[in-house]
Each structure stands twice: as structure tokens, then as C-alpha cells.
């Protein structure tokens, strides 16, 4: 689905945190979708997040919507350079009849850290695909998620971690509440 996002994407957002900069307040990206009366609607949000060495950012990405009959197909690419830390909170709270597919590609360098938290509630189908590359020693990834599901709602979490070198750490923990 990342290829479909690339094919239909017209614009996106770029966030770059400079070397040695600690952003003191969380940054929120709010994706708002609405269904169409005349037929299905697809949105293709795209974000590129780049943390330079020794920087820090808390990022909240939230998906909400009105109506029904829409599909969100998002891609987020995150590059975390040496000694940088990204705390990434992804909240999927689309409407009950929406579908939300997301692809997160995370690239970590030496002694960098990614702390990811994903929450899902109220959406018919959510599919998160997280692919992480631990490319240099000391890189650390922690990914946690919780889904609160009712009736026919579904949440699918796919995680692939590439331990490219020694002395890297990854942890993941997901729970579903039905």
C-alpha cells in the first residue's frame, strides 16, 4: 500500500529538527478525512521526519474523520541520526466505517532512540505496518500499542525489525481489548 500512496501523493509534510535542538513542546500532525456522498474517498497523507544528531522531538500523529466511506493510506518516513531521540505517538480515531492503513519506515543511526506508541479505537479496519532499521551500534527501538475494539472492528499490527549490526536493542508490546 506504500506504493499506492506514492502513486497518488500530491503533497506531504517535512519536519526537520536541527542538530542539538530539543523541541520543548510536542508537535502534532492532525489528519482529518471525510467520506464522500457520491462514492468512496481515499486520502494519502505523507510525512518525512528527520532528526539531526543529538536532537529530540515528541511527535503526535492523529487520524480523525467524519462520515463514512473513506480510506486513509498514509506513509511516514523517519530518519533518526546519531544520539537523537524521537517519541512518536500515533492515534487512529477515524470514523466507524473508515479504513486506515499506515506504513512507518524508521531508520536509526548510532546511539539513537525511537519510542513509538500506537492507539486504535472506533475504526472498522486499521492496519499498521512498522518497518525499522537498526543500522548502527547502540540504536534502540521500543514500540508499544493498544487497540480498543468493538463489534466488527479490526486492528492488524505488522512489525519488521532489521538488526543490521550488533549491540542494538528492540522491544515491542501490543495489546487488544475486545
Model-identified regions with their sequence ranges:
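Conserved beta-strand/loop scaffold segments within soluble protein domains that form the structured core
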Residues: 1-178
Amino acid at each position: 500500500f506504500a506504493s499506492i500512496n506514492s502513486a497518488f501523493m500530491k503533497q506531504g509534510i517535512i519536519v526537520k529538527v536541527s542538530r542539538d535542538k530539543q523541541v520543548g513542546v510536542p508537535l502534532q500532525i492532525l489528519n482529518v478525512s471525510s467520506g464522500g456522498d457520491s462514492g468512496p474517498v481515499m486520502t494519502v497523507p505523507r510525512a518525512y521526519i528527520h532528526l539531526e544528531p543529538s536532537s529530540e522531538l515528541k511527535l503526535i500523529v492523529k487520524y480523525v474523520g467524519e462520515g463514512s466511506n473513506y480510506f486513509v493510506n498514509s506513509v511516514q518516513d523517519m530518519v533518526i541520526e546519531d544520539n537523537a531521540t524521537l517519541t512518536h505517538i500515533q492515534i487512529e480515531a477515524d470514523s466507524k466505517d473508515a479504513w486506515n492503513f499506515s506504513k512507518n519506515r524508521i531508520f536509526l543511526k548510532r546511539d539513537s532512540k525511537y519510542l513509538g506508541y500506537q492507539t486504535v479505537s472506533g475504526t472498522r479496519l486499521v492496519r499498521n505496518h512498522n518497518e525499522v532499521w537498526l543500522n548502527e551500534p547502540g540504536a534502540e527501538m521500543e514500540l508499544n500499542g493498544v487497540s480498543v475494539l468493538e463489534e466488527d472492528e479490526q486492528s492488524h499490527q505488522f512489525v519488521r525489525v532489521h538488526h543490521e549490526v550488533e549491540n542494538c536493542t528492540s522491544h515491542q508490546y501490543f495489546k487488544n481489548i475486545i
